[in-house]
């Protein structure tokens, strides 16, 4: 029997695998800060991450990603600042380059039942389970 927290942790793991798949196809993930990047890496994310705070404002960020021409997956936080940034960036990206239409952000909210507001909290929420999941997956492949 899987407990609710373990179920969410498993969904988060699948979410990370999905992001990895998108990035192998050329997408880039955008997060707000360095802690968000660290949390994704802790959970096994291997693709390219753009940290919004490393840019000097929305215009510089959008200019950079639009020149790049790659699909952008916005995973900014769900707090007031993150929602405002997401809205402004989304409006500008709509005109300039491909993006995920906030699919992954909506999926993030749905899978966590709205309990996790910041990407950086993902690793705190499910890291112990994710480590067990990875160990289990590795052991089961070794048996086959």
Regions found by a protein language model. Name each.
Residues 7-10, 28-30, 51-54, 80:
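A short linear-motif detector with a strong N-terminal bias
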Residues 1-26, 34, 38, 60-61:
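Phosphate-handling DNA/RNA-contact segment within nucleic-acid enzymes
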Residues 26-27, 76:
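A general structural-boundary detector
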Residues 15-19, 31, 37, 53, ...:
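Aromatic-enriched hydrophobic runs in primary sequence
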Residues 2, 42-43, 48, 54, ...:
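TOPRIM fold recognition
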Residues 27-49:
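Short, contiguous, helix-prone interaction/anchoring segments in small proteins
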